[in-house]
Each structure stands twice: as C-alpha cells, then as structure tokens.
C-alpha cells in the first residue's frame, strides 16, 4: 500500500466516526471539496448517500459554477448579492483579518465616533502584541482616500446561507479545508472536528499528497486550474471582480 492509498484508507476511518445522517458535504467545486466528493462517490461509496450542498455566490468562475450545479443535490443562494454588499458595507481589499479591523475603524469614524482602542492600535501599528495591519493598508486607510472596506462578503455570500440551511435541517458541514493552506487556517483547523462540530477530515492533507491522489486516480481537474492555484473568492476589490462577471451569470 503506497502513501496515497494509506491516506485514503485513513480518510475512510475518519468518515466512519460520523453519523452521515447528521452531516452534509459542503461543495464549492474547488480542488479540496471535489476530492471529498470523489471520495464518497467513487472510492468509499458506503458514504455516497451524504447530501452534497453547494452555494452559488455569483462570484465563481463559470466552469466552477457549472460544476457546483452538476454535482450538488442542493444549491443555496447568498442572503445578499455582491452589489448589495458593496453598497451597504463596502468591498474587500486586503486580507480578511486586516479588512475586519479596517471595517470597524472606518465604521466608527463615519458615524462620528471614536474607534475602540484596539482598532486604533491595529490601524496605527501600535498594538503591543500580535497582529497589526500592513504598512500599505495603514497608509491607505489613514490617507483619508480609502473606499469602504469590509470583511463581510464571505459572511453574506457563503456563511449565512450555509448556517441557515444547517439550522433548518439540523445538519453539520463536512468541509474540504486543509490546515496548511495558510497560517490562519493552521490555527483554525488542527483536528478532524472543530469546536462547533464541523467535520474537517482533510485538515492534515498536504498539497503534495493531494496532487498525488488526483494523479493516481485521474480525478477531474477544471481547466481554470491551469491558470490559478485556487478558485475561492478573490482577494481583490469586489467592484473589480463584479465588473468581470457577465450579467447573465446572475440569472441562476
């Protein structure tokens, strides 16, 4: 048994720990979630009754969006559309963590209030321990020329519709996330289960091993991956992303 099959059998043992009637597969059409889709449909078919749920955020590459509709039992829609989020809250610009602090700093100043000390220190780079925003972000925000920046896009496009579905159906999600994708995710995902019961069986999967699984079993990879490494919502101003999306994509 090589490393690929050893990992897949270990993955099977992880799935055996859950009651599949209490979970659903959260399917984004990306490389990680599609690996889990392939796993339950082709490799460990004893789990193929798991419900597959996707979300059409209106922001996916067309190839990924078509994949979501093709492979999902249910496709959810956002609680707010991108244009609505842009109008009410602003647009993403830097990292999620930086956008979080910038959003609350800007919100307070727009309302004529003094931002909380933590937000001031994060923006000014005077926070004594831990994370502060980058020099580039700081200069832009303090210049007075910054547009409305927010971290809330993912919340309304993905998290809120998913949570509503989970509450209505009394289900927990199976997430295709890998802990070594970023330092933030490494902190968030350190075991198969999160504190709130989400199942994250790929938390310890390396990119090298994932690629080996795809190669050995000839798992379909969308053509868009020939040009980009990841297809999740882009970390660029959402107004730029929106301008790239044909209006016909909003008819789903």
Regions found by a protein language model. Give the residues of each.
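ATP-dependent adenylation/nucleotidyltransferase module used to activate substrates
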Residues: 1-216
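Mid-to-C-terminal catalytic subdomains of enzymes
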Residues: 203-252
